[in-house]
């Protein structure tokens, strides 16, 4: 080895030994100090005073028993000498045993005093020594870590140098022929190393004692180096494994990027092909038009040439044509006169027929009246079939024709009776048998249908509430296989579906539906499947009904085969109050804490809930003050002393809240969590009633005086949330990758050491809050709560407050039912905006509970940037589409182009770019599915189940900055309007998929066929077990009466039971 290698080696070994010696010395000091310290039991035994029969010789023997305790022994000897002097000088000599007793009492008292002083000193020393121990141990741990790192680095270097030197020395040793067996004299360590290299050629007996010692030392060093090398190998292997894993991940990322690029290129190529085909098709069309124009021009030119050639012959032909025209006019005049005479004769005949009909009316009055009354009682009505007339005649005779439907006939008036009689007599044959239409009349029928469509009757009935008239044109066979389209009529008195179909002359197998409330896509999907719409929206004749509200459905008269889109008593989940109360019953069904997915909510009209809210508001106020205190501490804000008083009381409140139930029950002062004095200090920064009244008065003056004009726009201050996110993004750009978790823990430990006692306690209790309360992340520094009216929707009447006085004033001033919920103060923000997620759910049965989840959800954004300073601005805190419609954003981006909404794909891609993995499918979507199942399980016993009933719900979720999803509310009959491009695409798809699930899948009886039926984007996420319905025992009074059986005698037969007379009622 070279001199440089030896120096490095020796330096590393010496440092390692010195550190080990220091550690051993520190440990020996600690052990010595521990030997000097006394246990509490030993101190109690030593501090006990001597008995009444006390002698100095016995005391000296006790001192000899414990020679190890030097400090206490010296002190005890001094005490003995002092007591002896006192006894010799002060006390007189007394006879008998009385003098000995008095001296022993004095010695006891003096001995007690000295012992107590020594014990206090020893206990103080103990505390100091323990603190020094802990400090030294931490220092030793840090030094050990540093030394290990250095040793590993130096061992790696030594190993590399050794390998090089060994290779060079092995080559030299092969050339040298060492065969002498003389005793060697080693001048340096190199000779020893060479001797070790040449193994087996020297014997130990030939070496001196010093050489053997050096060899042994060197071999021990080699063994140590080998151990270090083995450790280094393990370290390098672990690093190599991690390096290989990182390489694999990078390669997979590259492959994914390449695949994405390929997909993009393929999409671009397909777009280019489509464009190319469109261009070719346009060019082809233009060329054909050009050819047609050429041909027309050539025809015109040839015609002009022919006209010029025959101009001479044309003059003669013109004269002949004039003569022929005169003759034709004469004949036409004669024909017109004949027609006029025929019309006069027809008019005279019609007048005669009218007179005859009037005579018949008078004769048939009594007979017809009786028949009409019977028909009205039976619900049978006759319908006019209008004759086919051209468009002009229809317009003239619209006023003369009677209405198609007879709704309320006036039996008392003679005019109405006469009109009904004429209908009976003239059109009875038409009602019974329709005339067969021949093939020659098909064209006329189609023309008339087109004319009717031009006038306004499109042949399609929009199923909205309040619409009246005929329904869709239905096809009817004319006997020859051709279809005729006609309009359905309304029969309000018919309740039987089969009878209704007979009246409409429809086949018995056809299905009928009613759709109201603007769900046009559902009606289109049903028409594709051959269903027919009933024009009367209030009619009970249907197979399937989809309505906006439950009150449109008559549940008492429903039949088993009729399908309806609402369940009874579903308000327990679709209203804000119902959801708040029903989720508390989830404990009876599942062992789940609702605080993990539903922000805490209270009904302010319930006195118990109101009191709980006030207490919760005050405790969350204390928590927000502590969080503000810690932020100011880390930012080194000089105003932290102003909050110190509030922080101390807030800490006491939080510490009280963290106590367990057993401690609270035993504590007599645990009735109030916060006293009035404490709350006055905590709410020092809030409004009082006087300040609130003054604020309202100023607002009223501004409205009157017109001071609320548009002021010049100021630059918005960044909210605390935006500042924190901006700072974190800058730090990530500057620093690159974050530090390891171990380093973060070390930093936290160092910060905790630097904190004073109070801040350390605050820091620890906030940590405990995070562990115990899952909604700790929702409370920030502002303590914001959101108030919602229980009966309204679409963002109406919703306000945010962070002041208890304002909340109470808001609730008292307006008479309605209010619900208050904890506002999420740490929402996930996308491009400076707040958002929520709308998810559609379909429940097809409650026993067993079957839930269908529509996987294609969408995201709704607020209009303005997120800011907690202005809580009254709806455009920053609400994401409802009805609110965002009222304002347009100045800045345009991909969100505003889609109407302040996002598709699911856009949301997933944004989170992938931000986090590097699919956060939605891995973390957010499973939480959404869990919350849906748990919320519906909580209401399973409250909603009235009915087979062939379904219901669609709209779930609203929010996501916080830790990617925790929170259920906000559940809506019945969610909106299906084409408000934005996002909803237009999704509503069309959802309505088609609803029909697939309810009609195609639900009406199929065979299980094998169901497996092959498509359900679109709907996926069944849960199907529970069937629960047998309990028998209704309520209202029965069961009584059992009789006589008890008695034991017979030994020799008697079986006891008779004739006296037992049961009476059940």
UniProtKB/Swiss-Prot annotation:
ATP binds at residues 821-824, 834, 836. Residues 633-1009 form the TTL domain. Residues 54-63, 451-479, 734-754 have a biased composition (Acidic residues). Residues 122-146, 313-326, 385-403, 424-450, 722-733 have a biased composition (Basic and acidic residues). The keyword Ligase applies. Residues 1-146, 158-182, 301-326, 341-360, 381-482, 708-755 are annotated as: Disordered. Residues 73-92, 166-179, 404-423 have a biased composition (Polar residues). GO terms for biological process: protein polyglycylation. GO terms for molecular function: ATP binding; protein-glycine ligase activity; protein-glycine ligase activity, initiating. Keywords: ATP-binding, Cell projection, Cilium, Cytoplasm, Cytoskeleton, Ligase, Nucleotide-binding. The keyword Cytoplasm applies. InterPro entries: TTL/TTLL_fam, TTLL_monoglycylase. It comes from the Eukaryota. Pfam families: TTL (PF03133). Residues 23-53 have a biased composition (Low complexity). Residues 709-721 have a biased composition (Basic residues). Its EC number is 6.3.2.-. Probable glycylase which modifies tubulin, generating side chains of glycine on the gamma-carboxyl groups of specific glutamate residues within the C-terminal tail of tubulin. This is Tubulin glycylase 3C. It comes from Tetrahymena thermophila (strain SB210). The gene is TTLL3C.
């Amino acid at each position: 080895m070279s001199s440089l290698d030896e120096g490095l080696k020796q330096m590393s070994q010496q440092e390692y030994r010195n550190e080990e010696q220091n550690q051993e010395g520190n440990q020996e000091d600690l052990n010595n100090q521990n030997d000097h310290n006394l246990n509490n039991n030993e101190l109690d035994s030593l501090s006990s005073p001597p008995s009444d029969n006390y002698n100095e010789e016995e005391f000296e023997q006790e001192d000899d028993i414990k020679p190890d305790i030097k400090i206490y022994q010296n002190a005890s000897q001094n005490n003995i000498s002092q007591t002896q002097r006192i006894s010799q000088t002060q006390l007189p000599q007394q006879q008998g045993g009385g003098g000995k007793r008095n001296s022993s009492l004095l010695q006891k008292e003096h001995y007690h005093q000295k012992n107590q002083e020594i014990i206090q000193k020893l206990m103080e020393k103990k505390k100091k020594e323990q603190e020094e121990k802990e400090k030294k141990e931490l220092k030793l741990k840090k030094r050990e870590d540093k030394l290990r790192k250095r040793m590993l680095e130096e061992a790696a270097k030594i190993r590399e140098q050794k390998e090089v030197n060994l290779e060079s020395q092995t080559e030299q040793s092969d050339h040298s022929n060492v065969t002498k067996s003389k005793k060697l004299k080693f001048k340096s360590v190199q000779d020893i190393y060479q001797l070790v290299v040449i193994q087996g050629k020297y014997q130990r007996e030939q070496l001196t004692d010093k050489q053997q010692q050096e060899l042994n030392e060197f071999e021990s060093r080699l063994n140590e180096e080998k151990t270090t090398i083995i450790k280094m190998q393990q370290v390098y292997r672990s690093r190599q494994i991690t390096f290989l894993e990182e390489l694999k991940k990078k390669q997979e990322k590259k492959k994914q990027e390449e695949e994405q690029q390929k997909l993009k290129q393929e999409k671009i190529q397909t777009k280019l092909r489509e464009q190319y085909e469109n261009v070719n098709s346009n060019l082809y069309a233009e060329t054909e038009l050009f050819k047609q124009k050429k041909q027309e021009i050539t025809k015109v030119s040839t015609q002009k040439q022919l006209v010029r050639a025959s101009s001479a012959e044309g003059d003669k032909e013109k004269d002949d044509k004039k003569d022929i025209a005169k003759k034709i006019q004469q004949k036409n005049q004669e024909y017109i006169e004949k027609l006029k005479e025929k019309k006069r004769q027809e008019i005279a005949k019609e007048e005669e027929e009218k007179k005859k009909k009037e005579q018949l009316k008078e004769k048939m009055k009594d007979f017809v009246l009786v028949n009409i009354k019977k028909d009205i009682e039976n619900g049978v009505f006759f319908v006019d079939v209008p004759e086919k007339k051209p468009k002009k005649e229809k317009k003239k005779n619209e006023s003369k024709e009677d209405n198609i439907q007879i709704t309320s006939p006036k039996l008392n008036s003679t005019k109405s009776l006469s009109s009904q009689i004429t209908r009976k007599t003239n059109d009875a044959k038409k009602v019974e048998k329709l005339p067969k239409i021949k093939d020659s009349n098909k064209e006329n029928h189609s023309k008339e249908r087109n004319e009717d469509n031009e006038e306004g009757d499109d042949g399609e009935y929009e199923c909205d509430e309040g619409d009246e008239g005929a329904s869709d044109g239905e096809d009817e066979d004319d006997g020859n296989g051709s279809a005729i389209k006609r309009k359905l009529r309304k029969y309000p008195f018919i309740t039987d579906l089969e009878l209704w179909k007979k009246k409409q002359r429809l086949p018995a197998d056809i299905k009928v539906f009613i759709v109201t409330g603007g769900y046009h896509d559902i009606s289109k999907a049903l028409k594709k499947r051959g269903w027919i719409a009933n024009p009367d929206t209030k009619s009970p004749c249907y197979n399937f009904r989809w309505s906006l509200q439950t009150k449109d459905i008559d549940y008492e008269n429903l039949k088993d085969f009729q399908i309806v889109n609402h369940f009874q008593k579903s308000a327990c989940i679709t209203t804000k109050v119902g959801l708040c109360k029903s989720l508390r019953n989830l404990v009876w069904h599942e062992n789940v804490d609702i605080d993990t997915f539903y922000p805490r909510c209270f009904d302010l009209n319930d006195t118990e809930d109101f009191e709980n809210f006030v207490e919760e508001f005050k405790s969350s106020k204390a928590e927000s003050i502590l969080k503000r205190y810690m932020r100011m501490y880390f930012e080194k804000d000089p105003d932290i002393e102003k909050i110190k008083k509030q922080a101390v009381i807030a800490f006491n409140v939080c510490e009280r809240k963290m106590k367990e139930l057993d401690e609270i029950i035993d504590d007599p002062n645990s009735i109030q969590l916060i006293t009035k004095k404490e709350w006055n200090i905590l709410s020092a920064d809030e409004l009082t009633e006087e300040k609130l009244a003054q604020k309202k008065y100023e607002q009223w003056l501004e409205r009157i005086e017109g001071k609320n004009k548009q002021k010049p726009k100021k630059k918005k201050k960044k909210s605390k949330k935006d500042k924190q996110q901006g700072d974190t993004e800058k730090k990530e750009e500057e620093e690159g990758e974050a530090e390891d978790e171990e380093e973060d823990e070390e930093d936290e430990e160092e910060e905790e050491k630097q904190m004073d006692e109070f801040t350390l306690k605050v820091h620890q209790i906030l940590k405990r809050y995070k562990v115990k309360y899952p909604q700790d992340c929702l409370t920030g520094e502002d303590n914001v709560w959101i108030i919602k009216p229980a009966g309204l929707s679409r963002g109406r009447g919703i306000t945010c407050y962070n002041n208890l006085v304002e909340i109470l004033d808001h609730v008292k001033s307006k008479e309605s039912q209010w619900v208050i919920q904890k506002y999420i103060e740490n929402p996930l923000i996308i491009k400076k905006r707040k958002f929520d997620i709308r998810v559609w759910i379909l429940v097809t049965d409650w026993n067993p509970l079957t839930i269908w989840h529509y996987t294609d959800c969408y995201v709704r954004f607020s209009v303005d940037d997120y800011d907690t300073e202005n809580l009254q601005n709806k455009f920053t805190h609400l994401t409802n589409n009805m609110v965002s419609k009222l304002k347009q954003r100045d800045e345009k981006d991909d969100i505003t182009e889609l109407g302040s909404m996002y598709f699911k794909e856009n949301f997933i891609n944004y989170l992938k770019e931000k986090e590097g993995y699919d956060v939605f499918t891995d973390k957010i979507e499973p939480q959404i599915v869990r919350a849906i199942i748990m919320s519906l399980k909580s209401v399973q016993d409250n909603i009235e189940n009915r087979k062939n009933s379904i219901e669609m719900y709209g779930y609203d979720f929010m996501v916080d900055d830790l990617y925790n999803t929170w259920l906000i509310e559940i809506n019945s009959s969610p909106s299906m309007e084409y408000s934005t491009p996002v909803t237009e695409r999704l509503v069309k798809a959802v309505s088609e998929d609803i029909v697939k699930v309810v009609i195609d899948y639900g009406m199929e009886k065979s299980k094998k066929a169901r497996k092959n039926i498509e359900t679109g984007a709907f996926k069944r996420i849960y199907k529970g077990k069937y629960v047998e319905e309990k028998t209704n025992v309520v209202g029965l009074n069961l009584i059992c009466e009789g006589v008890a059986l008695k034991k017979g005698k030994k020799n008697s037969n079986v006891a008779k039971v004739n006296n037992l007379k049961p009476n059940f009622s």
